[in-house]
Amino acid sequence: MARDRLARAMAETLINKVVIDIKSDPERGLRNIIDLALIVPRGKFSRNLFSIVQRILSDEDSAYYTLVKSVASDVDTEILKKFTFNIGYNSCAYGARLIKSNKETMGLTAPWSIAINSAASENDADTIKKLISEGKDLGVYLYLI
């Protein structure tokens, strides 16, 4: 538990710095965050994911590069920090570790992300809240709505 709190605090500090760097110089900040992201993850999935992202974002003519640069420039700093923390730490680190642990100890296989159709009649607010709560218990921290 203390280890998770320490890792969480370190991730928040790192993300705060990275977001400030991206806001001040988006091109340089994007390169730095991807280079840094390749150092941090220990799992094969995370390393592969960040290698792909690095390759995509190294092409300044890429639509993804333009999108990320626009997000970095136009999205509120606090929202960008929260979003980055949720994807980077909660989903890729903490959640992935919990999914792996649950698979090893209970034989449960949980997805890394869940897509929710909010327009479907059976997916009312209470159902979605329950799904997210149950998903978090399994290590799922990324929801596509």
Indicate where each model-derived feature is located.
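Generic alpha-helical secondary structure signal
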Residues: 9, 28, 62-66, 78, ...
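Long terminal accessory regions outside catalytic cores
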Residues: 1-55
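Well-ordered, non-membrane alpha-helical segments in soluble/globular domains
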Residues: 85-89, 124-131
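Serine/threonine-rich low-complexity intrinsically disordered regions
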Residues: 4-7, 25, 102, 118-124
